Swiss-Prot record:
InterPro entries: KDSR-like (IPR045022), NAD(P)-bd_dom_sf (IPR036291), Sc_DH/Rdtase_CS (IPR020904), SDR_fam (IPR002347). The gene is KDSR. The active site is at S172, Y186, K190. Was identified as a potential cancer therapy target as its inhibition leads to proteotoxic stress in those cancer cells that overproduce its substrate 3-oxosphinganine. Catalyzes the reduction of 3'-oxosphinganine (3-ketodihydrosphingosine/KDS) to sphinganine (dihydrosphingosine/DHS), the second step of de novo sphingolipid biosynthesis. The keyword NADP applies. Changing A175 to T/V: Impairs activity. This is 3-ketodihydrosphingosine reductase. GO terms for molecular function: 3-dehydrosphinganine reductase activity; NADPH binding. Changing K190 to R/I: Impairs activity. NADP(+) binds at Y186, K190.
């Protein structure tokens, strides 16, 4: 009886693996596709643009700094695979005025055709203890990280639905999967992206438009270097429990997942564990993905509890050291 049950289980799992590709999205062909990348003048955004360009895409780079845009354009053009490819640069703040963003997208589509893939990579990080952060910092991060993704997505979605094809990528962060000391403003803005993406995916899936939410770890970018300048000790020590990734690695994974239409995009074993742990009611791209989440949930939750204990220990040690230092100063 046990052998029969085991045989049935194995057959069922094999059937899932065979059927899964049949219900998964058809991969997006990048050769000749029009890819718009916001925040594309540096860091992960620039590397994503390069990765897409290597595969034959036409690129529209969107960022605020025109000089950085032109420099990024030169770097990207070095990776062309044919002489027909184009890199278009548009300088605009995607978080300030929706009408301006909409006009910019229209200009890009008039020159390079309908947008096949939008990558929302514009963003910034500011860390600090909750009571030390200015209220304006919370407003600024929500504007840049959240509305800066809403506006471009809203500008392309109608055309994508009409054409019955498209990909929209939201670049969140592992801090958009779990809240960490010092990230009360940043994490909130990145968690918001997850809610937007889940709701939007349910709306556009019948139109063959697929959403990808990327959760990159700490990545060696100019933005990360700037973030480290003001990072609290607790935040820095917690961050140092994992390694820093290269932007090229992150970009390759994001582009791969976006092409496949995967809802989640993560990197490494920690990223895989976090995505499985925090899947909740998020959509799955394949039956096997859902099965893996069900099977691994218990184990990953156990591991996560040890991580949380370690993080809490770091915070307590820092607090004790700070209080000891303050008491020493008072008695000096």
């Amino acid at each position: 009886m046990l052998l029969l049950a085991a045989a049935f289980l194995v057959a069922f799992v094999l059937l899932l693996y065979m059927v899964s590709p049949l219900i998964s999205p058809k991969p997006l062909a990048l050769p000749g596709a029009h890819v718009v990348v916001t925040g594309g003048s540096s860091g992960i955004g620039k590397c994503i643009a390069i990765e897409c360009y290597k595969q034959g895409a036409f690129i529209t780079l969107v960022a605020r700094n025109e000089d950085k845009l032109l420099q990024a354009k030169k770097e990207i053009e070095m990776h062309s695979i044919n002489d027909k490819q184009v890199v278009l640069c548009i300088s605009v703040d995607v978080s300030q005025d929706y009408n301006q963003v909409e006009n910019v997208i229209k200009q890009a589509q008039e020159k390079l055709g309908p947008v096949d893939m939008l990558v929302n990579c514009a963003g910034m990080a500011v860390s600090g203890k909750f009571e030390d952060l200015e209220v304006s910092t919370f407003e600024r991060l929500m504007s840049i990280n959240y509305l800066g993704s809403v506006y471009p997505s809203r500008a392309v979605i109608t055309t994508m639905k009409e054409r019955r094809v498209g990909r929209i990528v939201f670049v969140s962060s592992q801090a958009g999967q779990l809240g960490l000391f010092g990230f009360t403003a940043y994490s909130a803005s990145k968690f918001a992206i997850r809610g937007l993406a889940e709701a939007l995916q349910m709306e556009v899936k019948p139109y063959n438009v697929y959403i990808t939410v990327a959760y990159p770890p700490d990545t060696d970018t100019p933005g990360f270097a700037e973030e480290n300048r003001t990072k609290p000790l607790e935040t820095r020590l917690i961050s140092e429990t994992t390694s820093v990734c290269k932007p090229e690695q992150v970009a390759k994974q994001i582009v791969k997942d976006a092409i496949q239409g995967n809802f989640n995009s993560s990197l490494g074993s920690d990223g895989y564990m976090l995505s499985a742990l925090t899947c909740g009611m998020a959509p799955v791209t394949s039956i096997t993905e859902g099965l893996q989440q069900v099977v691994t949930m218990g184990l990953f939750r156990t591991i996560a509890l040890f991580y949380l204990g370690s993080f809490d220990s770091i915070v307590r040690r820092c607090m004790m050291q700070r209080e000891k230092s303050e008491n020493a100063d008072k008695t000096a």
